């Protein structure tokens, strides 16, 4: 938010439920590696890049400074990072960093943006440089923090019908077990 900082009270159950919901969507593989580069003083960083891998038993690689694109790239390459969380701002830095080579992300299978609106030009430039789609999510600290996320579209092999889970300009589908209501105040 842009106002004065406020404390938000979340229970252990809030956090663990959100972690479980995210885990169900990401369908972890036994060899997955998550890059932990988001600050843990922010609910998105604490939940998805710190608590999620710890609770789900996923290997985690930590980088202290997410704005240091060269180090982020090196860590992704060295440790075969497969899941990358970030913000539009950080992804823009990676695109612009000449030391961040596209092959450094060759093991990444999922890139998810949160904490701020994913800018269309960032999404496009990231795909152009790295060949990877960024899936945008939505949440707030009060939602512990993820409420919805775009995911890759799926094709039913029997009917060849495409199921759309990724819509440009949208924040995606609600997490499993989540009901969202939009109201006009």
Identify the role of each PLM range.
Residues 2-17:
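Conserved AMP-binding A3 loop
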Residues 174-185:
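Conserved beta-loop-beta connector loops within the AMP-binding
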Residues 35-36, 60-63, 85, 110-113:
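Short catalytic-loop micro-motif centered on adjacent basic/acidic residues
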Residues 81-86, 95-166, 179:
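Gly/Ser/Thr-rich phosphate-binding loop
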Residues 1-3, 116-117:
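Conserved helicase ATPase motor motifs in RecA-like P-loop NTPase domains
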Residues 16-33, 41-82, 97, 152:
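Conserved AMP-binding/adenylation subdomain of ANL enzymes
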Residues 165-174:
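Short Gly/Pro-enriched turn/cap motifs at secondary-structure boundaries
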